[in-house]
């Protein structure tokens, strides 16, 4: 199976052939996947070199001319390093585009903290009007990328990861998918967290919602997952980025119902002995065994 990044390159290359409004902007990273596309469309596959602020500025400039830029590099460079340009060149200028990240929170532990961005979703969430997709499988990544490329002048962030679920689920570019039903609580699994969540809650009487679009937050699906007649609700959010990123959104969705929310994800404390991805996940308490202990302790 190809990776999400490989699927991004092949999908974006196909879209360049069919939509003259699209352009791909790169900052050295990912250029190999676009070699053929750059030869076919030298004016619409642009590599600015290792200049991430210029990467965003170029995308924003293209958007001002009426084009639809697909802007790509590691999340730590795309969002963290170039945040001021994202805020101004897309938000303040009122333009739209698609930011496509790789690396995520801990995809390359050996690369160190410079190549990790556990706070990307939370940071973008301080800005207005961004749709944010977190696919959990290459097929989902392709569907969401195609949706984002065709989304008029909207501002869209697509967060790719090396971690994937075993099978793709239907995605529409909005709304949570109900995967299983229960009565003791609701667990929202974001993107590549789904398989670990399902393994963790096996045998527990809980509902599981699958989120591949996290902004806008799907208030309606969360409320619908609460059993009819319930006077209280317990919700667990399992996100592959900063723990608690969506806690406020869940609280707002359930504002008129007494409830508790547990936000699980990447902690603020930096893990400095990185190891492998699996070791890093375990160190963060996001492996199935740790998730089960934390969920059952919360539900009592």
Task: List the model feature ranges, each with a label.
Residues 1-153, 161-300:
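Thiamine diphosphate
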Residues 72, 98-103, 134-135, 157-161, ...:
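Short beta-strand segments
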């Amino acid at each position: 199976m190809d990776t999400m990044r490989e699927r991004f390159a092949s999908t974006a290359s196909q879209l360049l052939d069919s939509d003259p409004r699209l352009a791909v902007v790169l900052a050295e990273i990912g250029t190999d996947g676009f070699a053929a596309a750059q030869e076919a469309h030298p004016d619409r596959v642009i590599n600015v070199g290792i200049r991430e602020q210029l990467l965003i500025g170029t995308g924003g400039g293209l958007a001002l001319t009426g084009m639809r830029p697909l802007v790509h590099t590691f999340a730590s460079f795309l969002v963290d390093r170039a945040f001021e340009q994202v805020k101004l060149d897309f938000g303040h200028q009122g333009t739209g585009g698609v930011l496509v990240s790789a690396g995520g929170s801990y995809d390359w532990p050996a690369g160190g903290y410079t190549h990790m961005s556990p706070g990307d979703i939370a940071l973008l969430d301080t800005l207005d009007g961004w749709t944010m997709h977190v696919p959990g499988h290459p097929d989902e990544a392709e569907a969401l990328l195609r949706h984002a490329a065709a989304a008029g002048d909207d501002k869209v962030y697509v967060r790719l990861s090396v971690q994937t679920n075993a099978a793709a689920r239907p995605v529409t570019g909005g709304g949570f998918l109900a995967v299983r039903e229960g009565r003791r609580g609701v667990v929202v699994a974001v993107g590549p967290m789904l398989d670990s969540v399902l393994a963790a809650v096996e045998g527990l009487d809980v509902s599981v919602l699958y989120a591949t679009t996290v902004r806008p937050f799907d208030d309606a699906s969360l409320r619908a997952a609460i059993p009819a007649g319930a006077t209280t609700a317990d919700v667990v959010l399992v996100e592959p980025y900063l723990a608690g990123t969506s806690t406020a959104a869940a609280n707002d969705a359930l504002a008129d119902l007494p409830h508790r929310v547990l936000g699980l994800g990447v902690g603020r404390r930096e893990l400095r002995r990185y190891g492998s991805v699996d070791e890093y996940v375990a160190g963060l308490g996001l492996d199935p065994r740790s998730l089960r202990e934390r969920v059952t302790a919360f539900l009592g």
